Amino acid sequence: MSGSYAPIEDSADELSVHSGNDNEIDLEKGLLPKCNTGNGGTTPCSEPPHYDSDAVVEMDMYENNIYMRTFKLRPFAKSGVTNSSNVVFQMKTYENNRHMQTFRLRPFAKNGVTNGVKLAQSLFLLLPFNFIFFACLFFRKASFTDFSLMGWILFGIWCLTCFLSSFILYAYHESWTKFARERSQEFSLILFGLLFPGIVTMVVFYALYMRSMYG
């Protein structure tokens, strides 16, 4: 009985085994994926296998451009449900640029003159009504200790109305000032309609107070 035996020359030969079709099999990565040949057979693919994870988290950092810093979170892989790959939550942060903060309320910032004018214009629309109201109270030598329960309730409604009106006027300053320049008559009617509940509250509050003081 005769046969040929080729001794192993190098330890690297132990990591590869030649099959009948002369394709190497990597013992660490496993078998190559099978590809269809068209006639019903399969042959090992030449391309390496692709592995899709269940969750892909992509974070694109643009250090030189803080406006383009985007964090993308994809909870599903492309191999899963097709529509689920479109679920992308993007959160843009602008850390080094104070002017581009999304949520901010800065009445007095670097452009404090502009924001100060906006705040002054918003409050100026309510000052005449408050001035008349408190002037009447001080003229009659009114005191907050003389207020009844209904008086305090009406006073709270009046303060809440003034606060909400000032906040809305400040938040939408560009919109209502542009509308006031273009359509001044309509703006006057709308402004009066918005402040009418506060005016009525002021009159009723003052009437109840005068009635409690002088019968």
From Swiss-Prot:
Which parts pass through the membrane? 119-139, 149-169, 189-209
GO cellular component terms given for this protein: cytoplasm; membrane
**Where in the cell does this protein reside?**
Spore membrane
Q: Tell me which domain of life the UniProt entry assigns to the organism this sequence originates from.
A: Eukaryota
Q: What does this protein do?
A: May act in meiotic drive.
What extra comment accompanies this record?
Although the gene is capable of encoding two isoforms, RNA sequencing data show no evidence of alternative transcripts.
Can you name this protein? Wtf element wtf7
The organism encoding this protein is Schizosaccharomyces pombe (strain 972 / ATCC 24843)
The protein's gene is named wtf7
